[in-house]
Amino acid sequence: MTGDGDSTPMKSYLRRLSVRSNLTAEEQEAILALPGETLSTAAHRDIVRPGQLTTFSCLVVDGLAARFDQLSNGHRQISALHIVGDFCDLHSLAVPEAGWGIQSLTPTVVRLVPHDALRKIISAYPNVAMAFWRDTVVDNSVLAKWLSALGRRDATARFAHLICEMGLRYEHVQLGTRERFAFPITQMQLADVLGMSSVHINRVLQALRGQGVLETRGQVFHILDRRRIEKLADFDDAYLLERKNRTS
């Protein structure tokens, strides 16, 4: 773990915020100047453990992380995916004791931003506080969509909805487009997220390929027919609060 005063780790987060919040130049500079330590971890390592009392929030700088719930028997369920530019647990500023865990799914780099620094910036800049709040609303909206997908969508729609969502999220932080993006997740991890077996995931993927809707090359997902996959998924991006959907 090393200290890092460079603003670069915060740039992707600023891009994410700017999708749905108007920030002044001064506010942007304050966000870029947030201090923190950089932690590099191998895949499948816990970054925050359930029940841990935290004094920081984790920003993903590189890789892919997941928030998870852990049962008393040790079994885990992924409840959120966090890409570059995501704060995994900005809400820990209000509730420091983790009721969840955060794990790296790939080799991952995170920025540990002290809660004290976050408190100072939201005290000094109320508009930044509102941007942070809006950001946590998006996290909750994503979770709500995942829950409805698990309960009410068939396997193909569930898979298609996640792919549509991830394309937009990678586009927001300028790491791809909504049609083409690198998504470093395994079929087993997808199975956990979507409540299916890895065999079922493979069947759905093959079916979408066969229909000419989706192409994959390694970790790169290429949506060949955006309109069709959105129809399959019944996808409406309003829950991601893009700027076009905002009134203020």
Tell what function each PLM region has.
Residues 1-43, 87, 92-94:
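Cyclic nucleotide-binding regulatory module and flanking cytosolic helices
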Residues 30-31, 48-51, 175:
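Short loop/turn motifs at secondary-structure junctions and domain boundaries
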Residues 38, 81, 112, 184, ...:
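Short aromatic/basic micro-patch
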Residues 45-107:
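Cyclic nucleotide-binding regulatory domains
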Residues 62, 84, 107, 115, ...:
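ATP/adenylate-binding site constellation spanning eukaryotic-like Ser/Thr protein kinases
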Residues 80-141, 145:
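Cyclic-nucleotide recognition modules
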Residues 127-195:
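Polybasic "coupling" helices that flank or enter modular domains
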Residues 169-248:
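Phosphate-/nucleic-acid-contacting segments
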